[in-house]
UniProtKB/Swiss-Prot annotation:
Pfam families: Com_YlbF
Gene3D superfamilies linked to this entry: YheA/YmcA-like
Transmembrane regions: none
Protein's recorded name: UPF0342 protein MGAS10750_Spy0713
NCBIfam families, per the entry: PRK13676.1-1
Lineage: Bacteria, Bacillati, Bacillota, Bacilli, Lactobacillales
Family: Belongs to the UPF0342 family.
Length: 113
């Protein structure tokens, strides 16, 4: 039985990769990588996201200046069709991932009830 669960997990991994929503994220990501300005903006977003996560993990909040930078970056992203499409595709994929997470972790939640 223990090997069987890994088989199911691998099957799920392949099924996620086959989802049209996953394929759309890949497609849009490739388009971003092919566009220098979109790629630079995406890299800036990733760096900002990592910085914010580090701050929050250490109990810090973004300064007013950093919040302004975040808002400016958000506006640039909204104005870029490729990045906007990427985040929309990510959102569509995240619906599946949230549902899968809920299903997979249901037995563990039952253990703490």
């Amino acid at each position: 039985m223990s090997q069987e669960i890994y088989d199911y997990a691998n099957q799920l991994e392949r099924a996620v990769r086959a989802l049209p929503e996953y394929q759309k994220v890949l497609e849009v990501k490739e388009a971003i990588q092919a566009d220098a300005s979109a790629s630079e903006l995406f890299d800036e977003f990733v760096a900002m996201q990592e910085k914010i996560q580090e701050m929050m993990q250490s109990g810090q909040m973004p300064t007013a200046e950093e919040q302004t930078s975040i808002q400016e970056l958000s506006q640039k992203i909204e104005a870029n069709d490729q990045l906007k499409a990427y985040f929309e595709a990510q959102q569509a994929l995240s619906v599946y991932m949230s549902d899968i997470e809920r299903i997979v972790f249901a037995p563990l939640k039952d253990l703490v009830k």
